[in-house]
């Protein structure tokens, strides 16, 4: 008999039902569960798949460059970044006739196009690209990298090139390679690009391979570096009247600490950015050389962790046993990596708008909104994934003997205290925040808005003042002109920073009031509840009072059969599943808050946010309803407009989102009955009954149906908000 799918599991391949297909897809990437898997093959498979991932990323970014070069308007955008709308790519086949063609022909294009809200134009412009030829060259280079990655992936699956397990578990060498080799060297290389290409480009000098060796990035060359007069590289920076991309008002400095923003582009000074990357490179190059590799010098990670025993005794045996636990568990390592990446992605969202690095991106409001929202959602999914793999670690990889009385074991020992504290925090935040909102709603409903409970966020305002914001009148730290902090920075970065933080047209340290106080606590509620569900799922993954042998059932199980009531919905997977809803909920509040506050800031009517954000009806009426008018008007009796596609996506997103509930509410029995009825009808219908299947149709398991429901809910939720965000912002600001 021919090998049936899935080849990695003979047990599943012989299953006579459609379960074979669905379980096969579900476990395709769970290499640990495959037949004949060894630890060595597991590591090699994962390692090789990383190269495939890199190849896809390079191919995708190459496609971005290629399509903009081919169908975009990069060269005309470069001439006037503030008024030309950047084109992402052409629309091949515009449906709905002539009105659609006219509606989508914009940005100086000859036919229908999509506008780019990704910020790539601003990024490419800032790093020194100027022509379509530059874009094509970049696309070809990335295509080359993509094919190299694919080749490397294939190569590392060949017997001669397969690394051994000991190579994968050599933690110090991996740290050396990642910290120094990847982060350190790439940061240094990026500094080099900024200094040699981007900064001259911002001063109107076009540096390419043909003149790269002739153009000195700094008039004094490498002299100051070798004589130790590094401060010369910071002298004569660009002036405040500098026109980006030209020599008008340009200086000669390459590494500065000016602080604040370039007045024309409203983005960080490129010379400050180069300085930052050089510092990062230095730190990582040093960090990567601190651990003992082939030369017998430096720290051993194992020795470090074994020595970490707090003397007070309150943390037991401290970090003893952690080295082997982490180094032998791929899930623990993945959990750590995802947690770090999730935090970084959220930080990227926060910093991209408050400290924009790319020229003119701060004035492209739709792009700012899209990038913030995109990065926050990505961060949410990555963070929940971190806890999922943390739970899988506890089920598959945790060894109690190896971790006796260390910090990991102690987390499990006092999990009741952790979970109940999180529960208490969530309840406190939820009841008090909702109570304040609802009280304010009632006061407005009865026509007595002056009876609202409005709380000034004085602690947050004090923190903003400490960073130099003067409008609140706190005379503290950087907002006090006679303190040591103020005097220390006055000659370098401080004037630029103070100018930026007290300027009302950017997004740096926005003025906050009672509406911000309330939504801050609503978001805190969402964060604590999401954390509660995820932490409980991981800490109870091995077992609980209700089900002490839970770890024997694996990561996801629906229920444990008759006679053990209450064991439904308590697998670690169920906790992850529930937490994703709360994560989406929380990021909804975060993005609503960000978007509404910024819309009013950009339109110059900040009072709308300040007055309406203190009660729920204000959010529903003055943010959601008021800003969805563009979507509801996307097509009307007078034909189409350029927002029609978003109006359609808004409806379609709602549809996908609502479909999720169908899977979330009706469970396995319903689908099984439905499928059997459909199969019966199929077999008795002429022509249709000529098509037969080998597998007996079986409904999805409860766990799978929940996954399908969750996927529809998440995708629909994000599609709906993406359409709302882009249409309402671009409808106002073009």
From Swiss-Prot:
InterPro entries named in the record: PSI_PsaA/B (IPR001280), PSI_PsaA/B_CS (IPR020586), PSI_PsaA/B_sf (IPR036408), PSI_PsaB (IPR006244)
Transmembrane segments: 46-69, 135-158, 175-199, 273-291, 330-353, 369-395, 417-439, 517-535, 575-596, 643-665, 707-727
Chain residues that bind chlorophyll a B3: 662, 670
Biological role stated in the UniProt entry: PsaA and PsaB bind P700, the primary electron donor of photosystem I (PSI), as well as the electron acceptors A0, A1 and FX. PSI is a plastocyanin-ferredoxin oxidoreductase, converting photonic excitation into a charge separation, which transfers an electron from the donor P700 chlorophyll pair to the spectroscopically characterized acceptors A0, A1, FX, FA and FB in turn. Oxidized P700 is reduced on the lumenal side of the thylakoid membrane by plastocyanin.
Assembly behavior: The PsaA/B heterodimer binds the P700 chlorophyll special pair and subsequent electron acceptors. PSI consists of a core antenna complex that captures photons, and an electron transfer chain that converts photonic excitation into a charge separation. The eukaryotic PSI reaction center is composed of at least 11 subunits.
One GO CC term, this protein: photosystem I
Cell location: Plastid, Chloroplast thylakoid membrane
Keyword terms: 4Fe-4S, Chlorophyll, Chloroplast, Chromophore, Electron transport, Iron, Iron-sulfur, Magnesium, Membrane, Metal-binding, Oxidoreductase, Photosynthesis, Photosystem I, Plastid, Thylakoid, Transmembrane, Transmembrane helix, Transport
Protein name: Photosystem I P700 chlorophyll a apoprotein A2
EC number: 1.97.1.12
Cofactor detail note: P700 is a chlorophyll a/chlorophyll a' dimer, A0 is one or more chlorophyll a, A1 is one or both phylloquinones and FX is a shared 4Fe-4S iron-sulfur center.
GO molecular function, one term: 4 iron, 4 sulfur cluster binding
Signal peptide start-end: none
Binding site for chlorophyll a B1: 654
Pfam family, one: PsaA_PsaB
Organism: Buxus microphylla (Littleleaf boxwood)
């Amino acid at each position: 008999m021919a090998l049936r799918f899935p080849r990695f599991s003979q047990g599943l391949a012989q299953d006579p039902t459609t379960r074979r297909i669905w379980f096969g897809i579900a476990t395709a990437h769970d290499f640990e569960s495959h037949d004949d898997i060894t630890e060595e093959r597991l590591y090699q498979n994962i390692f090789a798949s990383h190269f495939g991932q890199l190849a896809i990323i390079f191919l995708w970014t190459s496609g971005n460059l290629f399509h903009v070069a081919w169908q975009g308007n990069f060269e005309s955008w470069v001439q006037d970044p503030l008024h030309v709308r950047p084109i992402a790519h052409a629309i091949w086949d515009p449906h709905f006739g002539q009105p659609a063609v006219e509606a989508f022909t914009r940005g100086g294009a000859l036919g229908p196009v999509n506008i780019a809200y990704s910020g790539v134009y601003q990024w490419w412009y800032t790093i020194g690209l100027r022509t379509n030829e530059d874009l094509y060259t970049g696309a070809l280079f990335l295509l080359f990298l993509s094919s190299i990655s694919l080749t490397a992936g294939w190569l590392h699956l060949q017997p001669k090139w397969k690394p051994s397990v000991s190579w994968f578990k050599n933690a110090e060498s991996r740290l050396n390679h990642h910290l120094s080799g990847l982060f350190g060297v790439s940061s240094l290389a990026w500094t080099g690009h900024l200094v040699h290409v981007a900064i001259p480009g911002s001063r109107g000098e076009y540096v390419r391979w043909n003149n790269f060796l002739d153009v000195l990035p700094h008039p004094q060359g490498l002299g100051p570096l070798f004589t130790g007069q590094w401060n010369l590289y910071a002298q004569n920076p660009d002036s405040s009247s500098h026109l980006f991309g030209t020599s008008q008002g340009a200086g000669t400095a390459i590494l500065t600490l000016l602080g604040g923003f370039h007045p024309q582009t409203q983005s960080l000074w490129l010379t400050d950015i180069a300085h930052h990357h050089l510092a990062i490179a230095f730190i990582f190059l040093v960090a990567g050389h601190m651990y003992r590799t082939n030369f017998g010098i430096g720290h051993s990670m194992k020795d470090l962790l074994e020595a970490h025993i707090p003397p007070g005794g309150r943390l037991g045996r401290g970090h003893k046993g952690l080295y082997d636990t982490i180094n032998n568990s791929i899930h623990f390592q993945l959990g750590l990596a995802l947690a770090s990446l999730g935090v970084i992605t959220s930080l990227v969202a926060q910093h991209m708008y408050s400290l924009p690095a790319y020229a003119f991106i701060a004035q492209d409001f739709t792009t700012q909104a899209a990038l913030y929202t995109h990065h926050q959602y990505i961060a949410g999914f990555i963070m929940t994934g971190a806890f999922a793999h943390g739970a899988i670690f506890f089920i598959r990889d945790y060894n109690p003997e190896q971790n006796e009385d260390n910090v990991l074991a102690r987390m499990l020992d006092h999990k009741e205290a952790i979970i109940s504290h999180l529960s208490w925090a969530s309840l406190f935040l939820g009841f008090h925040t909702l109570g304040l909102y609802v009280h304010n709603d009632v006061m407005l409903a009865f026509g007595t808005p002056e009876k609202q409970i409005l709380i000034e966020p004085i602690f947050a305002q004090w923190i903003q003042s400490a960073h130099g914001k003067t409008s609140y009148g706190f005379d503290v730290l950087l907002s006090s002109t006679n303190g040591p902090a103020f005097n220390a920075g006055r000659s370098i970065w401080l004037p630029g920073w103070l100018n930026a933080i007290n300027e009302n047209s950017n997004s740096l340290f926005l003025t906050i009031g009672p509406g911000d106080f309330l939504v801050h606590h609503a978001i805190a509620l969402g964060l604590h509840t999401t954390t509660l569900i995820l932490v409980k799922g991981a800490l109870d993954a091995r077992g609980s009072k209700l089900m002490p042998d839970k770890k024997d059932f694996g990561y996801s199980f629906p229920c444990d059969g008759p006679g053990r009531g209450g064991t439904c919905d308590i697998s670690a997977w169920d906790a992850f599943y529930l937490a994703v809803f709360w994560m989406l909920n929380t990021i909804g509040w975060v993005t609503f808050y960000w978007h509404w506050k910024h819309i009013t800031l950009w339109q110059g009517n900040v009072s709308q946010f300040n007055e309406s954000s203190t009660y729920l009806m204000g959010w529903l009426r003055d943010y959601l309803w008021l800003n969805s008018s563009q979507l509801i008007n996307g097509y009307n009796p007078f034909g189409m407009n350029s927002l029609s596609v978003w109006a359609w996506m808004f409806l379609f997103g709602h549809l996908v989102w609502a479909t999720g509930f169908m899977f979330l509410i009706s469970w396995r029995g319903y689908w099984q009955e439905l499928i059997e009825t459909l199969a019966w009808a199929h077999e008795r219908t002429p022509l249709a009954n000529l098509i037969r299947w080998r597998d007996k149709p079986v409904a999805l398991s409860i766990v799978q149906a929940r996954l399908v429901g969750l996927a529809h809910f998440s995708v629909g939720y994000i599609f709906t908000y993406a359409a709302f965000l882009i249409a309402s912002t671009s409808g106002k600001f073009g």
